[in-house]
């Protein structure tokens, strides 16, 4: 499945209130159609310039080049529009970061409150009026743990999918204009808050540990990753089937989160399929160890690496 279709399918299956927080991939793709097409032999239409130098030599300050407001001297005319294109991408980064940081802070607070509730239940041991009262309190905690775990996994996949979309649209930009924007902008993205998922990963594992400790026989969400792996090996792209038992246990609101989580994880599995040609900027290369560590300056792509592959590297090949 092509990336655009995969991305659109995920947006349709995710939580409605999250949809406008994702990359505006389709509008950006349409915008590129207005850019002059670059020919390796003749350069862009009506151009006498054939300079192959990147516009941004300083990869640590991409936004500065977007603020000069005009044509960069000695650079291909197709790059007149690069400043406006980068401004749009920077606005998208700001949107990702704001949403991600707000959600992460919310998770920290909610998980701490749940841990305090668990401690309160332990302290009240033997003080409940009935066994049913104890069971009801524990089920409420369990439901809230399942809910927050699902939202955390959704946020991790939010990070991955938006990164994949940025890499894809930057590749299209470079191919269309003959520019060299993809590498410096991608290196900038690697250090953005929305792509720094180590703290979130720790929260996910802490939540899973509580689920497995308190409810070892009923940790549906903890086991969802293996279930999604099985789904991703097939070519079915319908919504995952949810058992009647799971539905009645989670409730309608939590079930929506659960289903969206499975859909997001299935989309990521599809995007992580390795391409036949190694590319240090490919989605699968950068995210293959996401569960263990975030990409850092030490293991990020070296600026000397070049992308010679014409094969799509942000999605499954066909």
Curated annotation (Swiss-Prot):
InterPro entries: SPX_dom, SPX_prot. GO terms for cellular component: cytosol; nucleus. CDD domains: SPX_AtSPX1_like. Residues 1-187 form the SPX domain. Residues 226-237 have a biased composition (Low complexity). It comes from the Eukaryota. One of its GO terms (biological process) is phosphate ion homeostasis. This is SPX domain-containing protein 4. It comes from Arabidopsis thaliana (Mouse-ear cress).
């Amino acid at each position: 499945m092509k990336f655009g279709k995969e991305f659109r399918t995920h947006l349709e299956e995710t939580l409605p209130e999250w949809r406008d927080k994702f990359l505006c991939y389709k509008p950006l793709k349409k915008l590129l159609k207005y850019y002059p097409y670059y020919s390796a032999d003749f350069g862009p239409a009506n151009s006498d310039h054939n300079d192959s130098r990147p516009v941004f030599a300083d990869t640590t300050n991409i936004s500065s080049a977007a603020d000069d407001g005009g044509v960069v001297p000695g650079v291909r005319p197709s790059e007149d529009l690069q400043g406006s294109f980068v401004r749009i991408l920077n606005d998208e980064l700001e949107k990702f970061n704001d949403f991600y940081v707000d959600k992460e802070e919310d998770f920290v607070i909610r998980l701490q409150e749940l841990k305090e509730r668990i401690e309160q239940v332990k302290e009240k041991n033997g003080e409940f009026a009935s066994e049913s009262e104890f069971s009801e309190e524990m089920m409420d905690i369990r439901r809230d743990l399942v809910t927050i775990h699902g939202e955390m996994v959704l946020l991790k996949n939010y990070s991955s999918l938006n990164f994949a979309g940025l890499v894809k649209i930057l590749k299209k930009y470079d191919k269309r204009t003959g520019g060299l924007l993809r590498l410096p902008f991608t290196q900038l993205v690697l250090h953005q808050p929305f792509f720094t998922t180590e703290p979130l990963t720790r929260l996910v594992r802490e939540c899973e540990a509580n689920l497995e400790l308190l409810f070892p026989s009923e940790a549906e969400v903890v086991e969802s990753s293996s279930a999604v792996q099985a789904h991703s090996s097939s070519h079915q792209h319908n919504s995952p089937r949810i058992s009647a038992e799971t539905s009645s246990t989670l409730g309608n609101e939590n079930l929506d989160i659960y289903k969206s989580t499975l859909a997001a994880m299935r989309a990521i599995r599809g995007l992580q399929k390795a391409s036949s040609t190694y590319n240090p900027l490919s989605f699968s290369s950068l995210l293959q160890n996401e569960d263990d560590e975030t990409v850092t300056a030490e293991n990020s792509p070296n600026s000397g690496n070049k992308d010679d592959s014409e094969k799509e590297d942000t999605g499954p090949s066909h």
